């Protein structure tokens, strides 16, 4: 499923001057993962350890022409064919785009959360259901603020069922993941001590995880936990 540069700019409310309106299908956050430069849009994520803006010129030289940025790189004048979509927060913009993409599909979506076992349960469900449905699922343990948008972006016209993990490590994170995954079926594996250091109590963590399930038609949980 493709979006044009101008469509994405509108969805994420970016400020931009578009050189060429491209057809885009790949979200890129890691310059080392580049495979289809012409179809990629690079989100220059800024973290405590790294700044994606450092890799824009390298990616431009490899054929990428579409970039979501917080600020224009110093070498911008050396990239005359680049489409720079400027936003306040590149991660929030990617999450906004993924949430929009999710809303284009009216299919069962299973959101899986819990302190342990999310990936195992997701893979078990895939094994059980893959003969009956065309399934999209989170790659490996893509359950973070960055991983969930990349997972949801895989949904396409052939998808009949989606399985997505949602992991949190501190309060106020799950509401963003819920907006992106927007599950119709919620599954909680358990509530344990994992990532407890980010929460004042187990009850606080439990309530935060329940945020994922607020719009679900069906919730599955272990009655013994």
Feature locations, PLM:
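Phosphate-binding loop of NTP-binding sites
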Residues: 92-224
